[in-house]
Amino acid sequence: MLITTQNLSIHHQKDLRPLVADLTLTINSGDKVAIIGEEGNGKSSLLKTLLNPDMVADYLLISGTIQRHFTAPIYIPQSLPLEMAELTLNDHFFSQVDLDIDFGLLYRYADQLAFDSDRLSSDQLISSLSGGEKLKIQLIKSLAKHSDIIFLDEPSNDLDLDTLSWLENYIATSPKTIVYVSHDEDFLAKTATKIVHLQSVKKKMLAKTSVQTIDYQAYRDQREAAYYKQIQQAQNDRKEFEKVMEKHRRQKSQVRNTLLNTHDATAGRLVAKKMKSVLAREKRYEKQAESMTKMPYHEDAIHLFFSDIQPVPAHKQIIDVQGEELWCHERLLVKNLFMKVKAGEKVGIIGANGVGKSSLIKFLYQHLQTRSDLQLGYMPQHYADLLPLSKTPLTFLAGEKDKEEQEAALTYLASLQFTREEVHHAISDLSGGQQAKLLLLKMVLDKANVLLLDEPSRNFSPISQPYIRELFSDYQGTLICVSHDRRFLREVCHQVYKLSKQGLYRLDSI
């Protein structure tokens, strides 16, 4: 075994909110352990704690025991470390001789991930890479190192479909132990052999942590079946208990009436004795009620919908791009871009990492911003491009003065599982999923009738994913998105296009 925990509990230092409760976990050699849970429930915190508690000591309180029996861990974080951004690719791969790296493997992984090996020694700044390419270079270098355990935080984020398939196969077939956080249901279904589920219930005052050595789909099915079985049992118990109590109330009422109407002392003593017996029986029933099957705690996910939007008339053209060029940092990405989208259409865009998908969404956003006939909603790849990180969720949505708007915003935030403390935290302190919820809520409040979304589902938990797909599937406006989420593309988008250097072309299937 590589990791064992006993009664591991984790709390936030700031507000003492529980994230992990009494986790007893064994991670053996070869296990593929997926950590899942709602946004802001502490998945990344648990991952770092299992790797090295010193990484979280500044903001978390940890109790219980953790034993580690690994010597060569690899860790790829959710976001590119700041110190890497201004390095060149040559710096990243070759500036220091690392004896743990198998360079033959490194070049093989670069080839398999369609990352031109000539670029490995180039002076291109890492900051100029696309989100998917930044993750690729970390995978290429890290996986070529000697290791006995791998920690990955949202490894499927930003990856194109080919790389995603490669990573799924790597995890599924690797003899190494891999512990990872993921939101991608297809990815989880193809890779996980053990599930650690972090839940937060009772308005985030109670943490529930469960572990199952089982694949993800079986876990979902088992959890859903157990949930509804417990509901049924709890309802049956209450129904039977109510029958017993109804009979008891009738008997108690009869004895009370008899007692009130008895004037004979001897008969009165007998009736009083009977009342004492009835009251004793009532106390027994109250104790029985405590042992009845409890209604299961349910962790709500996303409860949100677009209402009262004014759709653009169906005949109207939203996008009409004819033979334009797409540039990024003085680099020509696409030289002959044609794109037409009519009102009401839902279009998905896929393509290789670095081809320009996020640049295309930005281009369309700039193109549509000046249109007075549209109410535009936008979710960029990097939330900080739009979110004022120093503000709180409440002031971002409702400003600081309008009380009515603030009350409405508080109601919406509560429906998205923000606590009263979290609505006053700086946006920079929120998880990626919580920041995504804020952008989503902003679009709803703005009654946006055209949405431009860059990877809209990537930071939402597997529990929230079906709600997200339903939200956008029911949406009555126009939607254009970049996504590598296969379920999202299948269930939401009417058409899917692939972007390449030559332009966009329509796919029959994905």
Protein language model features and the residues they cover:
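Hydrophobic anchor residue at the start of the ABC signature
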Residues: L139, L440, I468
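Walker B catalytic motif
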Residues: E154-P155, D160, L453-P456, F460-I463, ...
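Conserved beta-strand-loop-alpha-helix hinge in the C-terminal portion
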Residues: V201-Q232, L499-I510
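ABC-family P-loop ATPase nucleotide-binding domains
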Residues: T71-K134, K145, R238, Q381-K442, ...
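Conserved H-loop
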Residues: D184-K190, D485-E491
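Coupling and communication elements adjacent to P-loop NTPase active sites across diverse families
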Residues: M1-H12, I101-L125, Q222-E330
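Conserved beta-strand
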Residues: T5-L8, D15-N28, G64, V321-E325, ...
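ABC ATPase nucleotide-binding domain signature region
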Residues: K32-E38, S44-I101, Q199-K204, K346, ...
